[in-house]
C-alpha cells in the first residue's frame, strides 16, 4: 500500500467534510482538549511535539466517537525572544520569520493527521488577538494590579532584556543559557503575589497531575512564621525579619541584611564604609543563583552597626552578605548559628558566638526520674582510625565514656576526668564540643531512672601514655578500641548513638527538641514555644504572626521589539495614563531595525514618530511606553480565545465560555509548571474576580509528557547529531506508523529513548492488520468465541486513552490482532479492531474500513463493553496424577467441584495413568488445577 497516498486522501476528506470543526452549542456534550500551542521555531516540528499531539489527538478522536462535541484547537505562540533571536540570526524580520515558520509547522501537523479545528487558528502576533491582550492589561492597571517600580531585576546580557524570576531559574537565561546579572530598572509589574493564597487554594478545584500541583505549591512557597522587628543601636531605624522559628530568637547572635538593603549606607560606620561599598559592587555582578548556592563559601562584611535582640536586649552585629536577597522576604534575616547550617558556617568564619537553644530528646521518659547533668566523651585514635569504647557486656552493652558532672565542675573538665578515670588515657586534645542532648535512661548499675542533660565531646588521642583506672565498685567493663563498623552495629543506646552522629557531622543541630538557654521558653517543645513567643512578641509590640510566600510579583516588561506594545502613555503632567480602549490595538510599528540596544532600552525607544503622542487625559505632549510584554502574556489567556475565536466585540463571550466551561484536558511540558501554567491561572483568577470569566479555574486536568530522547538516552540536539526529523519518518514509514510508535515507546509521562527497531516493529504490526483484512469472513456479526477478549480490549483501550497509558493500549490491540490471526473472525470483528486502533493510526484504519464497505470511522460510534463479558466463562486447567501433569480439561468458571473431578477422571490420558490403581484422594484447586493421588 502507498501510505503517503492514503494519508493525503483521508486528510483531504476530513478537511473537505469539516469533520473536526467544533460548534459552539448543540445537543452534544462539550469536551475541550488542548495541547500547549507551540512557538513556531525555524527547526519545525520535532518528535517531542508528535508525542504530545498524537496523545491528545487519540483522546479527541475517541471522545468524538463517544458522542462528544470536541474542541481540539491549534494556534501559535509567536511573540517573544525566541522568534526575535531566530530573526536576528537569519537576517529576516520577525514578522516574516513567524509567517514562514507557521506555514512549515502547519503543513507538518496536517501531514500527521492531527484532528485540529483549524477554523479557530490564530497567532498571538495577530493584531486582532493582541488587541485583547492589551485590553486585559488595561484592566489589570485600572484595578490596581499593574504598577511600575524600580527594582533589582534579572538581566540577560546576551538577550539584552529583563527576565522574570521564572525565566531566570538556576541563575541562567532560560532562552540562551547566559549567566543572569542583577540590574536596577524601572519595570511594569503585575501584583501576582496578591494571589498567592488564591492560587494555592485553587489547586483544590483542579484535577492536575500530582507532580504538577506539587511544582506549583513549591514555587508559591507558602510558609507560616513571624515578623520580628529589630531596632538598630544608635539609630532611629528598625528592620524586620521573617522567620518560621521565632522560638529560636534567644539563639540569634547576629543579623544579615541584603547588600541592596535601603539602610546599609546610613548605618555603616566610617571605618567599614570602604569594605562595604566594595562588597556591594561585587554582589551586583552576581546572579541570584550564584549568591544563594548552598555549597559556595560564605562571604560577608561587618557594617560596624549593631541590632538589639528584642527578647533579651543584647547587641548583636549586623553584617551584609550575598546569600540574603533584597527580593526575597524582607531582605533581612536573624541568624541562629546553633540551629542552621548556613548561619553556623558564617558564624564560624567570622568568630560570632553560637548559642544552643534547642536540644534533641532521646530515650523514654519515666516517672520519678533523677535529674543530673552529664557528658559523653568520644576519644579517637587517628593513627589506628579507631574509637575508644566501654563494653558493659550484658549490663548495658557497648558505650562511649560517660559520667556525671560534679558540682562546680565544667562539662569539659568532667569529660577529661572521666576518660582518665575509666580508661587511664591522659594525653588528649579537644576537637569539637557537641550539641547538648536531653536524655531519659535506666542505669543498670544503679537501678534508677534518670533524666539528664548531656554535653558531648570529641577528643583525639595524642599518645598512648596511660595511668591505671579509677573505678567505682559497681563499674565492671572492658575498655576496647573499635572501628566505625562495630560502633554502628553495637552502640544501641540512643544518647551515645546520637552523640556519635553529632561527632561524625559536626555543625548546627537542625532537628527539633526542647528549649534551653531561652528564659521563658525553657523546657517547651517547638509548638508550645512558638505559640508563647508569638504572644510575647505581640504583647511587646516587636513582632507578629505572618504568612510569607516565596512567589514574587510578575516582572512584565521586556526591552525588546517583538512583543505586544504596552498600551500606556507617560505624560509629564498626568504621569502614567492608559490608552483609550477604543484606540486598541496599539500596533507594533513596521521598522527595519529591531535588534536589542546596547543601552538596555527597547528598540521602540528609537522610533520617535511612534513614541511621541498626545496624552489621552489632558492632550499634552507625551510618550508611549517603549517596553513590550513578555512572551508569556499572550499565552496566559489563549485557551479562552479558542472558545470564541472570531469574536471582534470581546475577547470571548460569556455565553461561549459557559458552554465550554473550561479546558477538560490540557497537556504541556513540566518546565511550564511554574511559568506559563501559573501565569495563566493568575490571569484567569483576576478576570474571574472582575466578572469576565465564569470560573475561577478554567483548566480542569493538566498532564505532562516525558521527552523523546536520542537512542543513547541523551537529549536530542543538533550538536550531538541525534535529532530525528518527523518528516523523514513520515516519508519512509508513514504517519500512522510514527503515531503508533510514539504512543508505544514507553510510559507517556516519562522520558523515552528513540528506537528505530521498535519503530520498525510498529510498522510490522500495521502490516499485520492490513493482512488480516483478507482473512475476515464476510459476516456482519461478532464472533461469540472472541467475545471475552473483545470486551476486555474495549475496556482496556478506553481506560488507557483517558489515563495516559497509551503504550499499554497499543500492546492490548496487538494482543487482539494476534488472537484474530489464530482464529476465524468476521468483518464485524475486524472493524472492531480498526475502530479501536483508529484514534492512534487514523489513516490506514479508515482505508481498510472503507474497503469493507462501511461508513468512515470518523462518524462511527465508540464500542461499549459489557463488564460481565470481560470475564472468561470457560477456562482450561491442568490435571495432575501424583504431581505430574497428565492432561487438561475445559471447565466453566462456576463449575461444581464434583463435575470437575468427573471431567478430570474422564480424560483419556489421565485414565491410562490411574488405571488399576487405588485413588487415595482428588484435590481440586479452583480455577487452577486438579491433582489425583493414587497408589
Give a label for each model feature.
Residues 1-30, 273, 351-355, 360, ...:
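Basic, alpha-helical terminal appendages of large translation-related enzymes
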Residues 3-11, 47, 132-359, 832, ...:
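NTP-handling and nucleic-acid-processing catalytic cores
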Residues 23-92, 98, 121-136, 243-244, ...:
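N-terminal catalytic cores of NTP/NDP-binding nucleotidyl/phosphoryl-transfer enzymes
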Residues 77, 142-154, 544-574, 631, ...:
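Helix-rich, typically C-terminal accessory recognition domains appended to large enzymatic cores
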Residues 305-311, 315-326, 611-750:
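Alpha-helical recognition segments enriched in aromatics with Gly/Pro capping
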Residues 360-400:
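N-terminal strand-loop-strand
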Residues 405-495, 505-510:
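Unchanged
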Amino acid at each position: 500500500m502507498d501510505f503517503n497516498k492514503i494519508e493525503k486522501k483521508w486528510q483531504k476528506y476530513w478537511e473537505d467534510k469539516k469533520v473536526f470543526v467544533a460548534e459552539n452549542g448543540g445537543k452534544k456534550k462539550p469536551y475541550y482538549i488542548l495541547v500547549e500551542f507551540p512557538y513556531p521555531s525555524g527547526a519545525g516540528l520535532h518528535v517531542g511535539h508528535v508525542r504530545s499531539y498524537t496523545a491528545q489527538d487519540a483522546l479527541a478522536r475517541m471522545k468524538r466517537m463517544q458522542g462528544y462535541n470536541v474542541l481540539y484547537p491549534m494556534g501559535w505562540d509567536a511573540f517573544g525572544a525566541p522568534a526575535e533571536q531566530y530573526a536576528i540570526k537569519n537576517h529576516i524580520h520577525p514578522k516574516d520569520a513567524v509567517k514562514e515558520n507557521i506555514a512549515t509547522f502547519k503543513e507538518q501537523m496536517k501531514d500527521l493527521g492531527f484532528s485540529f479545528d483549524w477554523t479557530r487558528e490564530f497567532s498571538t502576533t495577530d493584531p486582532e488577538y493582541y488587541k485583547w491582550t492589551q485590553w486585559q492589561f488595561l484592566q489589570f492597571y485600572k484595578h490596581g494590579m499593574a504598577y511600575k517600580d524600580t527594582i533589582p531585576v534579572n538581566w540577560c546580557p546576551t538577550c539584552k532584556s529583563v527576565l522574570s524570576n521564572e525565566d531566570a531559574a538556576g541563575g541562567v537565561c532560560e532562552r540562551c543559557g547566559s549567566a543572569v546579572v542583577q540590574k536596577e530598572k524601572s519595570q511594569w509589574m503585575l501584583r501576582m503575589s496578591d494571589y498567592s493564597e488564591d492560587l494555592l487554594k485553587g489547586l483544590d478545584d483542579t484535577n492536575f497531575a500530582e507532580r504538577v500541583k506539587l511544582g506549583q505549591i513549591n514555587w508559591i512557597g507558602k510558609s507560616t512564621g513571624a515578623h520580628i522587628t529589630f531596632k538598630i543601636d544608635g539609630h532611629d531605624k528598625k528592620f524586620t525579619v521573617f522567620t518560621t522559628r521565632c522560638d529560636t530568637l534567644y539563639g540569634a547572635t547576629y543579623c544579615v541584611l541584603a547588600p541592596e538593603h535601603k539602610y546599609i549606607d546610613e548605618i555603616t560606620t566610617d571605618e567599614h564604609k570602604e569594605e562595604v561599598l566594595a562588597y556591594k559592587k561585587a554582589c551586583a555582578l552576581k546572579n541570584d543563583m550564584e549568591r544563594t548556592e548552598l555549597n559556595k563559601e560564605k562571604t560577608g562584611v561587618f557594617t560596624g552597626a549593631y541590632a538589639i535582640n528584642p527578647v533579651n536586649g543584647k547587641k548583636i552585629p549586623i553584617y551584609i552578605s550575598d546569600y540574603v536577597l533584597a527580593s526575597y522576604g524582607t531582605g533581612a534575616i536573624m541568624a541562629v548559628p546553633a540551629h542552621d547550617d548556613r548561619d553556623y558556617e558564617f558564624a564560624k568564619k567570622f568568630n560570632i558566638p553560637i548559642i544552643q537553644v534547642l536540644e534533641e530528646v532521646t530515650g523514654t521518659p519515666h516517672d520519678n526520674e533523677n535529674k543530673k547533668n552529664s557528658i559523653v566523651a568520644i576519644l579517637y585514635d587517628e593513627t589506628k582510625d579507631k574509637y575508644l569504647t566501654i563494653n558493659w557486656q550484658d549490663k548495658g552493652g557497648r558505650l562511649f565514656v560517660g559520667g556525671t558532672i560534679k558540682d562546680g565542675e565544667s562539662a569539659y573538665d568532667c569529660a577529661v576526668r572521666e576518660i582518665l578515670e575509666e580508661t587511664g588515657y591522659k594525653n588528649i586534645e579537644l576537637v569539637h564540643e557537641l550539641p547538648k542532648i536531653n536524655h531519659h535512661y535506666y542505669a543498670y548499675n544503679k537501678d534508677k531512672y534518670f533524666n539528664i542533660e548531656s554535653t558531648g565531646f570529641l577528643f583525639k588521642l595524642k599518645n598512648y601514655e596511660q595511668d591505671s583506672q579509677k573505678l567505682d565498685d559497681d563499674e565492671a567493663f572492658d575498655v576496647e578500641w573499635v572501628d566505625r563498623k562495630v560502633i554502628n552495629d553495637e552502640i544501641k543506646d540512643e544518647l551515645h548513638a546520637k552523640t556519635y552522629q553529632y561527632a561524625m557531622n559536626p555543625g548546627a543541630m537542625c532537628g527539633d527538641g526542647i528549649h534551653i538557654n531561652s528564659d521563658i521558653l525553657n523546657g517547651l517543645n517547638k509548638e508550645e514555644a512558638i505559640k508563647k513567643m508569638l504572644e510575647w512578641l505581640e504583647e511587646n509590640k516587636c513582632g507578629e504572626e505572618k504568612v510569607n510566600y516565596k512567589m514574587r510579583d510578575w516582572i512584565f516588561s521586556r526591552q525588546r521589539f517583538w512583543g505586544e506594545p504596552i498600551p500606556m502613555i507617560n505624560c509629564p503632567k498626568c504621569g502614567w495614563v492608559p490608552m483609550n480602549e477604543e484606540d486598541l490595538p496599539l500596533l507594533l510599528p513596521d521598522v527595519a531595525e529591531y535588534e536589542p540596544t546596547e543601552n538596555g532600552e527597547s528598540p521602540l525607544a528609537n522610533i520617535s514618530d511612534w513614541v511621541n503622542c498626545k496624552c489621552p487625559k489632558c492632550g499634552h505632549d507625551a510618550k508611549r511606553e517603549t517596553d513590550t510584554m513578555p512572551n508569556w502574556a499572550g499565552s496566559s489567556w489563549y485557551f479562552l480565545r479558542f472558545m470564541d475565536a472570531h469574536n471582534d466585540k470581546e475577547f470571548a463571550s460569556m455565553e461561549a465560555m459557559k458552554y465550554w466551561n473550561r479546558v477538560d484536558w490540557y497537556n504541556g511540558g513540566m518546565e511550564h509548571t511554574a511559568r506559563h501554567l501559573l501565569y495563566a491561572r493568575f490571569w484567569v483568577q483576576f478576570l474571574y474576580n472582575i466578572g469576565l470569566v465564569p470560573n475561577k479555574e478554567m483548566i480542569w486536568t493538566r498532564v505532562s509528557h516525558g521527552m523523546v530522547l536520542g537512542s543513547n538516552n541523551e537529549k536530542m540536539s543538533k550538536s550531538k547529531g541525534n535529532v530525528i526529523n518527523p518528516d523523514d519518518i513520515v516519508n519512509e514509514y508513514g504517519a500512522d506508523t510514527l503515531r503508533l510508535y510514539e504512543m508505544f515507546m514507553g510510559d507517556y509521562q516519562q522520558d523515552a529513548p528513540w528506537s528505530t527497531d521498535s519503530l520498525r516493529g510498529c510498522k510490522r504490526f500495521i502490516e499485520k492488520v492490513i493482512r488480516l483484512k483478507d482473512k475476515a469472513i464476510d459476516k456482519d456479526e461478532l464472533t461469540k468465541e472472541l467475545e471475552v477478549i473483545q470486551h476486555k480490549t474495549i475496556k482496556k483501550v478506553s481506560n488507557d486513552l483517558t489515563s495516559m497509558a497509551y503504550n499499554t493500549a497499543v500492546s492490548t490491540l496487538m494482543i487482539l490482532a494476534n488472537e484474530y490471526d489464530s482464529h476465524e473472525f468476521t468483518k464485524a470483528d475486524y472493524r472492531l479492531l480498526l475502530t479501536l486502533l483508529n484514534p492512534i493510526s487514523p489513516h490506514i484504519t479508515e482505508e481498510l474500513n472503507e474497503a469493507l464497505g462501511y461508513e468512515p470511522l470518523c462518524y462511527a460510534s465508540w464500542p461499549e463493553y459489557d463488564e460481565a463479558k470481560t470475564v472468561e466463562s470457560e477456562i482450561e486447567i491442568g490435571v495432575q496424577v501424583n504431581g505430574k501433569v497428565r492432561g487438561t480439561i475445559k471447565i466453566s468458571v462456576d463449575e461444581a467441584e464434583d463435575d470437575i473431578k468427573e471431567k478430570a477422571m474422564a480424560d483419556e490420558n489421565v485414565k491410562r495413568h490411574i488405571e488399576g490403581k487405588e485413588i487415595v484422594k482428588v484435590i481440586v484447586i479452583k480455577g487452577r488445577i486438579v491433582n489425583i493421588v493414587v497408589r
